[in-house]
Structures are given as structure tokens and as C-alpha cells.
From Swiss-Prot:
The lineage of its organism: Eukaryota, Metazoa, Ecdysozoa, Arthropoda, Hexapoda. This is Anamorsin homolog. The keyword 4Fe-4S applies. GO terms for molecular function: 2 iron, 2 sulfur cluster binding; 4 iron, 4 sulfur cluster binding; electron transfer activity; metal ion binding. Residues 131-161 are annotated as: Linker. Component of the cytosolic iron-sulfur (Fe-S) protein assembly (CIA) machinery. Required for the maturation of extramitochondrial Fe-S proteins. Part of an electron transfer chain functioning in an early step of cytosolic Fe-S biogenesis, facilitating the de novo assembly of a [4Fe-4S] cluster on the cytosolic Fe-S scaffold complex. Electrons are transferred from NADPH via a FAD- and FMN-containing diflavin oxidoreductase.
Amino acid sequence: MEQFKDLQKSLYIWTDSGELDKRVQTIKEATGGEVAVENVHRLSFSSYANSSFDLIVIECAQLTDNYVKLLHMLKPSGKLHLIAYIGTPASLLQEIKLSGFINCGEDTAANTLTAEKPGYETGSAARLSFAKKAAGVNVWKISGDDEELIDEEDLLDEADKQKPDPSGLRVCSTTGKRKACKNCSCGLAEELESERTTSSANTENAKSSCGNCYLGDAFRCSTCPYLGMPAFKPGEKVQLANNLLKSDI
């Protein structure tokens, strides 16, 4: 029992009282601490607090229903030592492992079994991290001087920098002589018909006091008889509508 040195508190579970004092003295000398005793048949009625002992020594291992109780009675990393047992070591070690003990082993020379309580208290919880988070890029520390900006001039070819030919900017039906379609529905046919009617106006009896009537509405007086008509060449005959130069009343 030299492996149990410097343990403060131990529990000895006995079946034969004939060697009780001798066993207790041996445990005291090996551990150097206090030793409590308990009968194996009274163990189920005991009321020991959890994590009370550093070592529990059992003389007879007929405790199938009490291994879990012993696990609670031991402190974290506490030892369980069986010095006498009934049954095969393999079956006992399996029962002990299923009760929560670890590092279970057999000493065939001494005919003993030893197990250990995990280094944490029964029922303890710990947070598990199954994946490591990748370190994020600290964008605030990126210097703007390191950015390579594209020069807009490099995106233009020599052909893009040449000025276009005005003759190539003409759009069909918007320059030159206007002509309405056969089935015109945009109003161009009516507009051209109105211009033809207006351009044929007779200005033989009309006289201009300012001499600027032919230039267009921008140069005409408010009472000009040609107001609203398109510009015309000097001396060109322009026919006025019949309702012009007549009072509305």
C-alpha cells in the first residue's frame, strides 16, 4: 500500500472483525492520515457526505449495488482498493468501470484491484469546444495606402479618346427633311399638314411696322398678325387665317 502515501482521510470497509485493528493500523502507517471504519453490510445505511475520503479500502468486494455510492464518497482523484474479492477480476473491473471509475487495474501478485475516481466531481459540467474559430481579419488595421487603385485612363483605348465625326451622329428621321409614315400615329402627319397650310398663307395685304415679323415669334410684337406662325423669308407670301385681324367680340 505504499502507493497511498500522504492521504489525509481513508475509509476501511470490513467483514471480519478479527483483524480489524491490524488492518486499520496498516492503513494508517501507509497513508499517514485518519482512518474511518464501516461494516460492509451497513454501508447502504451510512450517510457519508460526498467527497469525504481520499482512499476507500474494501476487504470483500460484494458491492455490485454500492460502487456508485463509493464513487460519490471519494474525493476527485480518490483511490478505491480491493484487498479481497469474490469472483473473477475481469467481471469486477467491468462493474467498477461501469460505475464511473477510471484507471482500473489488477495486481496479480498481491491479489488486489485498484481504481481511481476521475479528477472532477460527479455531476460537474464543462463547456466543450468542438471547432476552433478562425481568427478574423482585423480590417480596421489595414492601411489604405496599400490598396492598388486602377487608373481610369488605362481603361480607355486610343479610339475612345478621339472625338466623333458629327456626320456620324445623325439619327434617322430626326435630321434633314421630316416625312411621316404611311400609318402615322405619333401626330407627325398632322403637324406636317398644319405647317403646309400655314406656310401657304397670303401676306399681300399684311404690313409689318417693325420689319422683324419674318424672324419668328421671338422677334414679333404681341399684336403681330404673324404670331404663332413659323418664320419665313423676307418677301415670301404668307396667307393669314380668315379669323385673324378680327375682333373676338
